[in-house]
């Protein structure tokens, strides 16, 4: 099993898909890494040679990508700083509402959580 950036990649997936299991690497970055490492995108993770694994590791290190824990920490610190300066976005984060301008009158249930029951009109 290939281990890159501290993550075990799934053996049965193509390497271009397997790399996206690392937090901070999406499709485009995975393709760039493989192109620079000289590895085909169609190779399965289980079929990688140790030389190919080393080339991928070296390329990921060389690109200076923030991955996994560092990236998660950076995102949470950015959100925390928005909340501390009481910006509009920070307030929306604190209240658990959509941050990017979506309407909340009818939708936004994912962000707001389950609907709270309101007592109906008595007959």
From Swiss-Prot:
GO cellular component assignments: cytosol; small ribosomal subunit
Has keyword Transmembrane helix?
Answer: no
Q: Which InterPro entries match?
A: Rbsml_uS13_C (IPR027437), Ribosomal_uS13 (IPR001892), Ribosomal_uS13-like_H2TH (IPR010979), Ribosomal_uS13_bac-type (IPR019980), Ribosomal_uS13_CS (IPR018269)
Q: Where is the composition biased (Basic residues)?
A: 108-123
Q: Which GO terms describe its molecular function?
A: rRNA binding; structural constituent of ribosome; tRNA binding
Q: Domain of life of the organism in this record?
A: Bacteria
Q: Does the keyword Transferase apply?
A: no
Going by the UniProt record, its keywords in alphabetical order are: Ribonucleoprotein, Ribosomal protein, RNA-binding, rRNA-binding, tRNA-binding
Which Pfam family, giving just one, matches this sequence?
Ribosomal_S13
**GO terms for biological process, alphabetical:** translation
**What ranges does the record give for the region Disordered, renumbered to this chain?**
93-123
The cross-references to NCBIfam families, in alphabetical order and at most eight, read: uS13_bact
State how it assembles: Part of the 30S ribosomal subunit. Forms a loose heterodimer with protein S19. Forms two bridges to the 50S subunit in the 70S ribosome.
Summarize the protein's role: Located at the top of the head of the 30S subunit, it contacts several helices of the 16S rRNA. In the 70S ribosome it contacts the 23S rRNA (bridge B1a) and protein L5 of the 50S subunit (bridge B1b), connecting the 2 subunits; these bridges are implicated in subunit movement. Contacts the tRNAs in the A and P-sites.
Similarity annotation: Belongs to the universal ribosomal protein uS13 family.
- This chain belongs to the protein called Small ribosomal subunit protein uS13
Species of origin reads Leuconostoc mesenteroides subsp. mesenteroides (strain ATCC 8293 / DSM 20343 / BCRC 11652 / CCM 1803 / JCM 6124 / NCDO 523 / NBRC 100496 / NCIMB 8023 / NCTC 12954 / NRRL B-1118 / 37Y)
What broad taxonomic lineage does this protein's source fall under?
Bacteria, Bacillati, Bacillota, Bacilli, Lactobacillales
